[in-house]
């Protein structure tokens, strides 16, 4: 709430006749570091944007974010050219954008000012609003352009700075920014300029990027990408952290088919108690980011998302057992192999 007060996110006013106020709620989150250790507890007040009306209190909603394919290319270039990587985090990012629409919101639970007719008239964007991402991206885009960065046409989540023999890549994912430049590049002027516009946290050399764990060996010029912590959390969430490790994603000769799907409503109802779709979604994410070795298994399992049977469920658990035994598998970039 102190952040909202300092930011002048809203002002308390009496709800005008004919206007309606959307709701608000508290969202609690435990933030962890790359190794799974506790970073901090976060309490975020969000607007109930699902009650907004299109064309009335919001118009645009789209906000670009950097693609994983772009990240892989940048990491490959960083390995080949021995670039320095520096991570930045913008605190309370969505609170920086100014709203164009007139939006009223009921006061947060536990913080009441005035009578029952008094509400918050939003002056700045807020988490939960339909247009929050678009408003924030518009603000960040204008700041980066003023600093001399240019947005690439191939990926609107990637900015490039080229001036006075200084070349910097800047991939943007909402409020997470990464600076990539040649060794010896002084990032301080860029960080100071960003700090004059936003509350910024300099996280130092990049060890985590879009959930990917980054490990660098500057002596041997290698960079590796892993998802150990994500896999550990996945196993714990589904209660199989102590499962027996196995060596293959699917059983040799495994052939899943629709004939193994439930044939009656009772059988389908029985299968709904298992988090099949949740697990397959996590496997698809892993296959896309850092574990291509499970791509085939994840794709096969995804074919039966609408009506999985017991055999499909056992196959999904089989992949989890494989991940248990391959926690430390990494994608490794080697500079001499990229030439």
Label for each model-derived stretch:
Residues 1-339:
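Long, low-complexity, charge-biased intrinsically disordered regions
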